[in-house]
Structures are given as structure tokens and as C-alpha cells.
Amino acid sequence: MRLDARAALQCHEFLHKSFAPGCFDLSERAPESEMMRELKRQGDIHEARTIENLMTKNLDILVINKDQGEIEKELTTAEALINSTAQIIIGAWISSVCEEKIAELTGRETASDPDRVSRPDLLIRVGEGADGKPRWAPVDIKSHDPINENKSSKLYLATWDSLLPTEGVETIARLDLDDAAQLAHYYEHLRTLGLATDEGFVGVIGRDIETIAWAKLSETALGLGGKAGDAGVDYLFKFDVAKKIVAAAQARQKDPSLPPAAYSALESDAKFGCGACTF
């Protein structure tokens, strides 16, 4: 079972009920709220505006056709990752078919990540590895301000005419932690495939569509003075827990006599917590 970039952030009860629906009465599931529908609509509008603006820049951009089937998207993504001259890939889709095609194109053993499927908004070429193959960094488009005050973290603010993180202006601040967790998912998948940077660069384009807020996951600190670790390590822990919840829920779906995979816990987060839950 491959999980997407939201899994590490989702409530365990939501995961439990999603993967063991036969163990619950879900007939009175709450409808999605008007607020959530409007937030999604505004997010789609912002993403379209950001991409429209990006296409006006003098950059080599490859767009994966969103009307293709999943297999075609994955094959096109693999070709783009390995053989294209593109500086930016829009709409990449990375799962098993893409992984197998990458192995074919590079002549090396398939580097599979059986736990993840990745669909980043953008992938930006940030260099080449010792093998001569491109290295990519994931970038998401967000309609909110992705930058938070934090004295223990660093960002590198770049513009489209000098888009690499190494060309960005260093700033003492931190990416939104939910955004960082989603980007960590994509980074970890790329790392497994040998296509990520050693520095762990990820980025967000927020309300200011002319700026890329780059960060190193290891410099995205949690807790006072970074004593609670960094966003990359935190994501790996939460994703591992999510995998266990899903596995237990799938087992319970087959055998309802098994104990619950998780217990309810109030979580106020509007995007991923109880405020957004339809169960």
C-alpha cells in the first residue's frame, strides 16, 4: 500500500476508518463544509495563477499532461527526470511504473519505495550528481504565507531569474511545518531513487508568486532552539506511525475481531485535523 504526502499528517482515527470502513457505521458521514470547499477552490485558483505566471518566464519547463492516464503520466515523468533538459517539471507522478522506467533508463537496479506515491506540484532541477544524472528538489504551491517566524531555522529566498536555492537570500525564518512535512515525503521518495540533493532542499511558492522559499529539511527546526529535531526526522517518525496504523486497519478490515488500530484524539488543525474530518 503506497501512501501519499498527506498520510503523515492525517489523524489516526481518519486513517483507521478509511482503511477499515467495514468496522464502523459510516452512513451518517458529515458532508464537506462550505468553508473547506471554498478553501480548495481558492487554492486551485492560486495554483493556476502561479503556473500561468511561471509559463511567462524564460525557463525550460516540461508539463506532464494531466489528461493522460496514470501509467502514461509515470512514464513521462521518468523520461523527464532522467533525459529531459527541463529546469522545471510540472505535474510529476512517481510510483512503481515510474520507478521501473527510471531503472530502465539508467541501467541500474530498480530503486523502489513501496510505501510512497508522490505528486509534487513542481520539481526543480538543482544540479547533477556524480553519476551525471539530474538532481531535483520538490516545490509545492500554497495559497497561504508559507513563512513563519523562527530564530532556529533558515530559509533561502530566490526569484525566477535566479531560482536555485544556492542563489537565494538567506533569511532567519521557517517553512510552515505542514508544508515541510509534505515536501519531506517527496524528498524522501526522490532520495530513495537517487535523484535528490544531498542538502535536502525543498521549496514553497506562497502568496508571493515571484518568490521561492527554499529550505533544507535539516535546518527546519522543531521546538525551542531546535531541541525537538527537524522537519525531516519528524516526518519520518510520523510516516512510520501512519504506515503501522494503515496496516493494522487493513488487517482489522479482514478480521473485525482484531483490536482498534487507533483511538480518537481531538486535533484542531483546520486542514488535516478534526475540523476537516468528514467521518
Stretch-by-stretch model annotation:
Residues 1-133:
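Metal-dependent nuclease catalytic cores that hydrolyze phosphodiester bonds in DNA/RNA
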Residues 13, 91, 118-121, 140-144, ...:
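Residue-level signal for functionally critical sites in structured catalytic/ligand-binding pockets
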Residues 17, 40, 57, 66, ...:
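Context-gated lysine
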Residues 54-58, 98, 143, 250-254, ...:
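Generic secondary-structure transition motif, activating predominantly at the C-termini of alpha-helices
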Residues 87, 121-122, 135-137, 197-203:
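Beta-sheet entry/capping signal
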Residues 92-96, 124-128, 142-145, 206-209, ...:
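Short, flexible loop/turn elements at secondary-structure junctions
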Residues 118-169, 186:
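Conserved catalytic cores of phosphodiester-cleaving nucleases, focusing on short active-site segments
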Residues 151-181, 185-278:
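Metal-dependent nuclease catalytic regions and adjoining charged, substrate-binding loops involved
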